[in-house]
Amino acid sequence: EAISGKFKALYCEGEDIAQSDPNTQHVTHALESMECVIVQDLFLNETAMYAHVFLPGSSFLEKNGTFTNAERRISPVRKVMQPKNGYEDWEITAMLSNALGYPMNYKHASEIMDEVASLTPTFKGVSFKKLDELGSIQWPCNDESPEGTPTMHIDEFVRGKGKFFITEYVPTT
């Protein structure tokens, strides 16, 4: 939809979509179509080459937050040194948001996690405190599974029977 002009801008934080997406030509064409691309990262990666604005990122050693991997495991990240750029990633995002007129007046990354937990049913029971106590949690983490859910869909899928989609085979050239 970026190519068609429906999306005008993109804010990409800590992800190299021009390199990591399976269809890089489609992604780079979409990036070229944007009126404004803002990239926040540690490195001038492939996506940054399309950026109109580049903001400095923080390493995992310089910020508080979480990482969630492909097995749904939410792991805590705790700052061990001050960010060399002066700010954690979430602080830069909040400052940009405030400057654009959408208030994000957080004082700590834990407040963001609390908001995510209040708005996302599968994260309802997640907090910095619980992550620090347990080490990591696999979502969903809620009233039914207060310490997370290591295995999903044991008896059935959440939405009933599994859904399969037929896709067209496209041979490589």
PLM features: what roles do these ranges have?
Residues 1-127:
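Non-catalytic alpha/beta scaffold blocks inside enzyme catalytic domains
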Residues 113-173:
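Long, low-complexity segments enriched in small/aliphatic residues
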